[in-house]
UniProtKB/Swiss-Prot annotation:
Protein's recorded name: Uncharacterized protein PM0613
Classification of source organism: Bacteria, Pseudomonadati, Pseudomonadota, Gammaproteobacteria, Pasteurellales
Keywords assigned: Cell membrane, Membrane, Transmembrane, Transmembrane helix
Primary site of residence: membrane
Membrane topology: Multi-pass membrane protein
GO cellular component, one term: plasma membrane
Superkingdom to which the source organism belongs: Bacteria
Amino-acid biosynthesis in keyword set: no
Organism of origin: Pasteurella multocida (strain Pm70)
Localization of this protein: Cell membrane
Listed InterPro entries: Phage_holin_3_6
Transmembrane segments: 35-57, 72-91
Length: 130
């Protein structure tokens, strides 16, 4: 009876642990989804506003500038916009690198839990399997 009770306790503990880990994974997935929605919404609004502002700027400059300075000004605007695009792409790359570690901690903890359960059941350790 004692062995049966031990197996029952290990099973219940394992199920509770799995439930907690799945809740943690769900919370991390919700946070990731919210981050992506916010990021994509902000990028869309920024793109539209940038497009409208540049079109207005170009129409205004076209009517104000004399023909000789138009080329210099328009090329400078194009070079400045290209430089800003490069900076924003580098910033986006940096932000996305931070997201690479998404759920790594949770998965590591799940692996530790599995090893602890195997140890409690008396099965061979992971060192023997690797």
């Amino acid at each position: 009876m004692q062995i049966l009770q031990k197996i029952k306790n290990i099973t219940l503990t394992s199920l509770e642990l799995i439930h907690v880990r799945l809740d943690m994974a769900r919370i991390e997935l919700v946070e990731q989804k919210n981050f992506l929605i916010t990021l994509l919404s902000a990028l869309f609004v920024i793109f539209i506003l940038l497009l409208v502002s540049f079109i207005s700027l170009l129409f205004g400059l076209n009517s104000l500038l004399d023909p000789e300075t138009k080329q210099i000004v328009f090329f400078a605007i194009s070079a400045g916009a290209f430089f800003l695009i490069l900076i924003l792409l580098l910033l986006m790359r940096k932000i996305l690198k931070k997201q690479r570690n998404f759920m790594v901690d949770t998965l590591t903890e799940v692996k530790h839990d599995i090893q602890a359960i195997k140890g409690a059941l008396g099965s061979p350790s992971s060192k023997d399997q690797e």
